[in-house]
Amino acid sequence: LVGSEMCIRDRSLTCSYCANFHKNVYPELKKNFIDEGIISIEYKSFPLNIAALNASKFAHCENDGNSELLHFLYDNQNEWAKGSTAEEYNKNLIKVIKSGNFKIDEQKCLENKSLEDHILNDRIEGVKSFNINSTPTLLINGKKFEKSLTYKNLKKAIEKLL
């Protein structure tokens, strides 16, 4: 499994279960498997709504998927993932990103059509290739991980492949 890829398709940044995974499971996974070079992780976008799509745009736009911004967005999800219109979501999102001192050109990110296409194509690929219909969904070596996304379950699955 050394160098094997685990693909996390939990990038609906408005998904509370995804935020929980990112905050409570990912750190142990990173420490014990990613940092040790046993697995690598590739994030794919699977936005469930316009707020998640725009958050994904910011995470990729000038940061190329910068994990620091990704962590920040998950950690502050309750502050920005609220509103009844796209404008409200965007206003909250921009306010939270600025509070973290990230340097982002908001309009450039929001209006980036090729980036939007890339993010939406990740979602389409997930549906077509892996029958993904919800978040979080995790793939290990191209196969859906069907158990509860706890560190214990993931550790057991990874160790079984070693």
Language model: regions and residue ranges:
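A broad, low-specificity signal for short, low-complexity segments enriched in glycine/proline
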Residues: 5, 18-21, 96-101
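Sequence contexts marking disulfide-bonded cysteines in secreted/extracellular proteins
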Residues: 8, 16-19, 62
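Cysteine-centric redox/oxidoreductase cores and disulfide-bonded domains
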Residues: 47-135, 139-152, 156-162
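General small-molecule cofactor/ligand-binding pocket signal
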Residues: 42-44
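Short, small-residue-biased leader/transition segments that mark boundaries at the very start
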Residues: 1-8
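Short pre-active-site segment immediately N-terminal to redox-active cysteine/selenocysteine motifs
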Residues: 11-17, 47, 134
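Typically the conserved alpha-helix immediately C-terminal to a functionally engaged Cys/Sec
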Residues: 19-34
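A generic structural motif
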Residues: 37-39
